[in-house]
Structure formats: C-alpha cells, structure tokens
C-alpha cells in the first residue's frame, strides 16, 4: 500500500513538472560584462535543484564524518553493556544452580565492568540498580559459602547503592534478603528490626509476614507471632488447615507462658473468639489455670464453647480431644472449690441422656455423681461406661473409682478385684 502511494505521488509530480516545463517560454539573462548569458527558466530550476541536492549530500557526509568518534564510543559502550548483562545472567544462573563460587565471581565482574564504564566518563541510567543487584547476588553467594565478612561487605554496598538512586523495590529486596540471612544466623532480633524498617506497605507482603512469623517465634515473642499468623490467615497465605494448626500452637504456647492466674487471664483475653473456641486451646488454658491454683468455675467457663461443640457435634473432636476435655472437667470437679454447680449438672445430665451410648459422657457423669456423693448412681454409670471405654487411662481410672465405691460400701472382695484390674490396665 505504501509503495502504491509513493508511485501515485511520483506520477503526480511528473505530471505537474511536465505541465509547468512543457509550455514555459521564460528565460533568465545573466549580464557579466562584456558577456551576456541567456538561460531558460527550466534549466535554472534544474540547476538550483541539483545545487541543493549536492549541498545536502555534502552536509550529510560531513555530519557522518564528524559523528564517527561519538558512534565509536557508543558502540564500545553497547558492547560493554552487553558483556555486563551477560555476566549478570551468568551470576544468577550459577547461583540458582548451586555454583556459588562462580556466581560470586560473575557478580563481581559485573561490578568491575560498571566501574570501568563510569571511569571512562559514561553514565549508566540504571547504574545504581545494577550495582545493587550485583552486590546482592554476590552477598547471596557469600552467604551460601558461609563467608560472613564477604556477605556483610557486599550487603553494605548493596544498601548504599539501593539508597543512592535505585528503585524502591531494589532497596526492599535487599532488606528482605538481609532479614532472611539474619534468620539463618539465628539472629531473630536483627531480622525483626530489618522487617520493621521496611515500612507499613512492604512489611505486609506475604514473604515479609512469613519471615516475621518465623523471627517472632524464634525470639519467643508469642503475641507478635500470633498477630502475624492472623494476618497470614487473613491474606490466605496459609491453607485453612495450616492456619488453624499454627494459630492453635501459638495460642497454646501463649497459655503455657503464663505463670500466675492473672497472667493467664490476660493471655486468654488476647486470643480471638475463634481461637478460644478451639478444643485444644480451651482445655490447655483451663488445665493451666487449675495448675496455677485459679478459679475452677472460670476454667469451666473457658471450656463451655468446646463442651457445646462436642455435645452438639457441630465440630468433630478426636477421641483424644474428648478425653482431654473430660479429664480437665474432672480435675476441676475434684478441687476443693470446684464442686459442679447446677448449670453444669444440668449440662452433663442432658448430654448423657442425649447420648446414652457415649462411654466418655457416662464416665464424666459417674465422676460428677461421686463428687455429689450419689454412690449408687455413680456405680451404675461407671459400670456401664467400663465395657465401652477405649482409652486405657479412662479404663484404669474407672476401675480405681469402682474400687473406691466398693470400699465405701464395705465390699472388700469387689474392691480388691477392682484394684487388681486397675493395676493390670
């Protein structure tokens, strides 16, 4: 299409020239005493056109001649840039391939070439950025080689170049790498400081949050680790199962870190409602409260959501979780001030009637009856639960309780047999 348009334009110019020059009788007379030169107007126009063409070509030739040194310098600069970029690719390729010595050597060669270009008077617009990246690759290789002095030297240089004029992403990448190296060195406080220096936006990225979680756990900052894990779960950086496992472990760690009932209650209040409803967290917190001599009624209040879930079967509790929950309630009932109130009596009785075949609930109901000195009812419930209990510790304690009931009623033969069965379980 373009060629056709050019041909049409050429034909138009030819037609216009033919119409103008074909019937043009004009002439130009040049007086140069004692001479007189007569020239046709068409010839003069052709000569002027040729003159301007020659002048233009001469100007182009002179411009090209004087531009040769500059073009040669640009060509050399492009060749150096190409070599520098190839060396940078070699550094990255060797680094991911595990050839750390070669990667470090290639990254350092990039730095040498950049300095050579700048010493020649040329300025690279991306100079600070490529220098920061090269120092970062060299530091990564030195870190893999356990060369800590070399790593720190390249890290400081990378930070300087990243702060001098590189893009913000480069500086953030350098800080993230430095935080990861600090974690590898087991220096959690330095890692947290570097992550704090990132700022609000970069510090909430998934990679930064993962490192913050690891550093907080390493530094035994359970509250900070718990907050970070919540952010990761909110951003869906962890699967639902993994998030629940991490939150559960951190919540239990926070509970175990309390050394008196006041600290434990403060730690419990720092947990979310969902975390408090986790069966493992609730039972561990209630058990820890009883160990510290806390209020048994408060421990049962903490256990109430897990109890309701177990009874209503809204969530599936494992057999171990059910046993742990019942054991914690039993321990609270056994304390001096832990006698079950009317509310818990109604809950246990209702749960046992709704699930008459559940041996764990029968065991708990029997223990509650013993605490209230209802010996006959307790003996009946414990005997019914004994045949279906699978947990060895519950079976052993059931035999022990039956032995105590037999001694209470004066049946020494039954008590002896029950004690023997408890010892054999």
Predicted regions and their residues:
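Transmembrane alpha-helices and immediately adjacent membrane-cytoplasm interface residues
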Residues: 44-75
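Membrane-proximal, non-transmembrane interface segments of integral membrane proteins
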Residues: 71-179, 185-190
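Flexible helix-coil transition and linker loops at the boundaries of alpha-helical arrays
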Residues: 76, 114-128, 161-168, 238-241, ...
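Structural register within alpha-helical repeat arrays
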Residues: 90, 131, 138, 178, ...
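Residue at a conserved register position within TPR or TPR-like alpha-solenoid repeats
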Residues: 94, 135, 142-143, 182, ...
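Structural motif corresponding to the intra-repeat A-B loop/turn of tetratricopeptide repeats
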Residues: 97, 145-146, 185, 219, ...
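Alpha-helical repeat scaffolds
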Residues: 108, 149-160, 187-199, 223-235, ...
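Alpha-helical adaptor scaffolds
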Residues: 146-147, 159, 171-180, 315-391
């Amino acid at each position: 299409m373009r060629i056709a348009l050019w041909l049409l334009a050429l034909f138009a110019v030819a037609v216009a020239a033919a119409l103008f020059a074909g019937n043009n009788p004009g002439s130009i007379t040049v007086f140069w005493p004692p001479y007189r030169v007569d020239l046709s107007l068409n010839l003069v126009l052709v000569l002027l056109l040729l003159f301007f063409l020659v002048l233009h070509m001469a100007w182009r030739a002179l411009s090209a001649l004087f531009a040769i040194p500059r073009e040669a310098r640009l060509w050399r600069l492009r060749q150096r840039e190409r070599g520098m970029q190839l060396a940078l690719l070699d550094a990255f390729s060797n680094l991911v391939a595990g050839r750390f010595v070669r990667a470090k050597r290639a990254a350092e060669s990039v730095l040498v070439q950049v300095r050579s270009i700048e010493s020649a008077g040329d300025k690279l617009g991306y100079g600070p950025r490529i220098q920061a990246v090269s120092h970062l690759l060299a530091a990564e290789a030195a870190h893999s080689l356990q060369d800590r002095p070399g790593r720190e030297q390249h890290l400081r240089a990378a930070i300087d170049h990243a702060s001098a004029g590189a893009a913000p992403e480069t500086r953030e990448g350098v800080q993230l790498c430095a935080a990861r190296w600090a974690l590898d060195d087991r220096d959690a406080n330095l890692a947290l400081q570097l992550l704090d220096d990132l700022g609000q936006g970069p510090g909430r990225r998934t990679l930064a949050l993962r490192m913050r979680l690891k550093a907080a756990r390493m530094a035994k900052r359970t509250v900070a680790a718990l907050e970070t894990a919540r952010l990761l779960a909110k951003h869906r950086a962890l699967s639902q199962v993994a998030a629940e496992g991490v939150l559960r472990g951190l919540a239990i760690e926070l509970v175990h870190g309390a050394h008196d009932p006041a600290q434990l209650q403060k730690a419990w209040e720092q947990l979310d409602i969902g975390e408090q409803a986790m069966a493992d967290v609730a039972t561990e917190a209630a058990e820890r409260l009883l160990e510290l001599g806390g209020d048994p009624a408060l421990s049962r209040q903490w256990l109430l959501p897990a109890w309701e879930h177990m009874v209503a079967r809204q969530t599936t509790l494992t057999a171990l979780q059910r046993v742990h929950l019942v054991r914690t309630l039993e321990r609270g009932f056994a304390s001096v001030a832990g006698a079950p109130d009317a509310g818990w009596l109604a809950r246990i009785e209702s749960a046992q009637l709704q699930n008459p075949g559940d041996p764990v609930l029968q065991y708990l109901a029997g223990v509650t009856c013993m605490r209230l000195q209802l010996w006959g009812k307790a003996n009946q419930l414990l005997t019914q639960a004994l045949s279906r209990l699978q947990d060895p510790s519950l079976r052993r304690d059931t035999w022990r309780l039956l032995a105590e009931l037999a001694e209470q009623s004066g049946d020494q033969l039954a008590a002896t047999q029950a004690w023997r069965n408890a010892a054999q379980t």
